[in-house]
């Protein structure tokens, strides 16, 4: 945390960014969301992290988020295991649950109203090779701004460095700087519909095979 800013200042700045993102995202048409989601997912699928992962954790998209279901379907096609978050709002915890389908018969809603498998094996964090992370906003250093619950920060903090973490967003969700606190966790890379940004380009596992930006 920047010593020049109090926790209250940081909360105010985060809330201001959330408000700005709501305004930006509200302008998107369904066609734009679909087109930009397709572009971002194509970059994810081309990443070395995805190619090498045997088990991928990704989120169930909300209307304002990049739709990553095509990444899951490609993972299924390649024989990879897929898991998605299940949140326990009362305990403020997140776990990963394996899924093989996203149809209505297989899915339900967790305590926050986000789709999650009705049944499924809980996957230990050390068994996950790649985590695809949503966010309200990201900066070029890999810091993300979530919705304020802290679920992903607490969950990501327990991963080893060997697990690749990649944020995904629409390009309009990039900001110059996310105000941070000690509990905020940066992802290793961020992928949007227009670019791929790596916090540590020397880490081969996180290299993005980006044909449009060579």
Label the predicted regions.
Residues 2-127:
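N-terminal active-site beta-alpha-beta segment that forms phosphate/nucleotide-binding
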Residues 3-4, 90-214:
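Conserved phosphate- and dinucleotide-binding cores of soluble alpha/beta proteins
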């Amino acid at each position: 945390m920047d010593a020049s800013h109090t926790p209250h200042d940081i909360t105010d700045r985060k809330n201001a960014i959330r408000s700005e993102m709501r305004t930006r995202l509200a302008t998107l048409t369904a066609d734009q969301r679909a087109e930009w989601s397709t572009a971002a997912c194509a970059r994810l699928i081309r990443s070395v992290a995805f190619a090498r992962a045997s088990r991928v954790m990704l989120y169930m998209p909300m209307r304002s988020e990049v739709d990553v279901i095509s990444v899951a379907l490609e993972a299924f096609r390649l024989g990879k295991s897929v898991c998605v978050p299940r949140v326990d709002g009362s305990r403020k915890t997140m776990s990963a649950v394996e899924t093989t389908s996203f149809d209505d018969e297989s899915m339900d809603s967790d305590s926050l109203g986000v789709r999650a498998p009705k049944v499924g094996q809980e996957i230990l964090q050390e068994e996950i090779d790649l985590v695809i992370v949503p966010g309200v906003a990201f900066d070029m250093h890999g810091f993300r701004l979530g919705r304020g619950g802290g679920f992903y920060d607490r969950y990501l903090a327990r991963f080893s460095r060997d697990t690749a973490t990649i944020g995904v967003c629409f390009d309009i969700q990039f900001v110059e700087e996310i105000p941070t606190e000690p509990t905020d966790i940066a992802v290793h890379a961020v992928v949007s519909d227009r670019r791929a940004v790596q916090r540590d380009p020397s880490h081969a596992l996180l290299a993005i095979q980006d044909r449009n930006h060579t």
